[in-house]
Every structure is written in C-alpha cells, then in structure tokens.
Amino acid sequence: MLVKPSIISGLVRLTSHSPSSSSSVLRRQEFLVRTLCGSPIIRAMSSTSEADAESVLRTVTPSLDLKRHKGQAGKIAVIGGCREYTGAPYFAAISALKIGADLSHVFCTKDAAPVIKSYSPELIVHPVLEESYSISQLSEEDKREVQDKVLGEVGKWMERFDCLVIGPGLGRDPFLLECVSIIMLLAKKSNVPFVIDGDGLFLVTNSIDLVHSYPLAVLTPNVNEYKRLVQKVLNCEVDEQNAEDQLRSLAKQIGGVTILRKGKSDLISNGETVKSVSIYGSPRRCGGQGDILSGGVAVFLSWAQQLKSDPESPSENPAILGCIAASGLLRKAASLAFTKHKRSTLTSDIIECLGESLEDICPAS
C-alpha cells in the first residue's frame, strides 16, 4: 500500500500535540508512525534505519498498577560468575532490577556466590555451578552425577523465568561451559528467551547449533566478539562499508536469531530488518556497560513478550523491541552519568542513572 508523506506528517503532528490523549491511544499512534516509517516504501525515501528508541521504551514499559503482584514485571536469571569474575553477573542482575524487573537471580559457582551476595541483598544467588578444578579427582561417572545435579538445580527453576542472561563472568572452564550448553538446551525446550553475552558468546561461536533457528535468542557481541562470529559463520572479515547488510546476513545465517552489534551506533538485526540506535551515548568506555545492556535486553524482551497477548500491541519481534529499548536506555544513562562524573564515570554510576533515565522517558505516574 502506498502511504502518502502527508499522512505520515499528519500522524507525527497528532502524536506530538495530543497531551490529553490516553496513554494507550498515544502508544498506538506512536507505534503506527513507527510501523509506517519502517515500511519498504518509506525506507526507500530515507537513508537511515534509526529506531525511535524512546517511543519503543514508552511502548514496552508496563504501567505501574496496584493490582499487579510480585513477579509480573519480570523474573530474570543470570547464568555466570566464577572465581575470577564476580562483577559482570552482578552488573547484569542488578541492572535488571534497577530497570524494573521484580526478581533477579544469579546462578554462579560456589566460589563466586559469597562475593556476589555481598554486593547486594536484592539478588537471589544460587551457588550451584561447578568448575573443572573442583571435580578433577572424580571418576567420569561421578563427574556426570555432578553435572546432573547442576542441571537439576537450574532446571527446577527454568519455567519460572521470563528471560535468561547467559555469559557475564562465566569464564571458559570446559566443564562449566558444557553444563551451560545443556542449560541453553533446557531453556529452548521451555521456550524461555535468553540473551548471550561475554563468555557465552565464546561458547556459541564454537557451537552455533546451540542458538541456530531459535527466535528467542539474542546475541550482544562487542567489536571483537562480532569479528569472531563473522569469521566463524560467514567465513570472511568484518565489512564496515556494508555493515548493515553483513549483520543481516549473519543473523539470517544463524537462523533468524537477533544480534545486537555494540558500537558507536548499535546495530540490531534478526536477518530480516536492521535497526540502529545512536542517540545519546558517552565517550567513557569503562568495562561493564555490556553487562548493563544484557540485563536490560532481558527485561525489555520479557516485557515485549507480555505485550503479545494484547491485540493492540506492536507486531514487531519482541527481541528486536527489547534490544532497541535496552540500547536507548543504556545510552541515555551513560550520557547522564558522564555529565555528572566525566572521566571518573564507572559502571556503577551508570547503573544508578538507569531509573532516572527511564523515568524521564516513561514517567511512572
């Protein structure tokens, strides 16, 4: 259907000057504009695929209602955390809470658990994962028993979760990675979405079948992780001149998973469409921001999933919406934190700005 530019302009004016409209009507108007502006005809009129991150945030963020009960705003679980790395799983899990999830779990190794528990009493920490050194003296049969126990501990919680974050602080221990690969299969069997980051991407890059053709999988690679994915899957080098087309090809080759390529502009694709998010941002590149992003994607993806039961909800892929929303919010929070702290900005400063940033875009009252 040909959509006249005058119609688009009218809709934009309507959404910009309707303060008395109900929030539900306004959200439908905003989504209609986004949908039309993303149509093939309108895309041909524009050279950009920039997503309206703030509008997506307002669309997917649920309103606060006294009738809601604990858990309805999201139950997130982070699979990660070992002897060497305890900060990353904490950043991902606490970010999920700061954005608005009701419950946030961390499944980590026994060595990491006391440390992560000490960071915050808000997190539910499960010290159930095992590393090779702790079972090195066991027979193969006993090792399998340990693995079965680990999988049983995680599996009994699986269907309670709205989304998993797999990889922050995971490390590359062979036994641990083997257990996590089976956890991913359990999640797929239960249709639980998951976000893969950090060392989870190392695992997936070497075992693409773990995520292939699973539409509820999201990969969030940084520049080096993306390079390894491209080399492994497409058997070529990263092509910055055709970045969008290459990202689309990569996501399509992995069976339509959603990939959020982090960078100066975040690029997002599920093999069909490509969206970019470049608003806000910060020149401070302290470690841990990717963990905030993965926790945020998990929350917004779960919220977008909840919208699917609403006949007036957006029809776009929940994973795409989750990535756009999380990217936009992180960029705004990072910008705000940098304004306050400049060169001394840390990941913890950005986390403290998440609530303020979301409130500015999508007021709770």
UniProtKB/Swiss-Prot annotation:
It is an enzyme of class 4 (lyase). ATP binds at residues 262-266, 281-290. It comes from the Eukaryota. GO terms for cellular component: chloroplast; cytosol; mitochondrion. Coiled coil: none annotated. PROSITE patterns: YJEF_C_3. Its cofactor is Mg(2+). Pfam families: Carb_kinase. Residues 1-43 form a transit peptide. One of its GO terms (biological process) is NADH metabolic process. Its EC number is 4.2.1.93. Keywords: Acetylation, ATP-binding, Chloroplast, Cytoplasm, Lyase, NAD, NADP, Nucleotide-binding, Plastid, Transit peptide. GO terms for molecular function: ATP binding; ATP-dependent NAD(P)H-hydrate dehydratase activity. It catalyses: (6S)-NADHX + ATP = ADP + phosphate + NADH + H(+); (6S)-NADPHX + ATP = ADP + phosphate + NADPH + H(+). Belongs to the NnrD/CARKD family. HAMAP family: NADHX_dehydratase (MF_01965). This is ATP-dependent (S)-NAD(P)H-hydrate dehydratase. It comes from Arabidopsis thaliana.
